[in-house]
Amino acid sequence: MLGFKNFLKEQVEVESILKYYPSPREVKYIRSVRHKLIMKNPDMKPIGDDKLHVTLAGGPWWKKMSSKFKDVKFDDPNFQLEFEEPKKVESSGKVSWYMKVKQQRQLKDYVTDLLQSNPNPKRVFHVSIANKTGKVGDSVANV
């Protein structure tokens, strides 16, 4: 069950990356898919509900520009995210499972509106749901 804290959290937050935290409804769906995935792949560990996120912007451009957005409260997307079926990705010794956001164009336009720029034009918006350790930093970043 989601803690009360999750209902108070902004959905878009400026951190070392610009993150979108899934809504409680989205988390519920992701959790059910993740549970089935872990049952079929017991070597994978789930990423905790409170760590689930979609990276909206990151990389060198974001590192340079993020301080300009530190105190900005961004509007949340005005659409519910939907996700594709989970896929496995491997890179540099890391293995993770992710779910791609179905509304790639809509989310790209949303980020461009927020930042008045598209810092990662080739970004594939996704949420990592499981990896070898369950630690979010151990997921493959770019799918």
Give the ranges of each region predicted by the language model:
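Histidine-dependent nucleotide/RNA phosphoesterase domain, centered on the 2H-phosphoesterase fold
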Residues: 11-143
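Proteolytic processing junctions in secreted/extracellular precursors
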Residues: 2-11
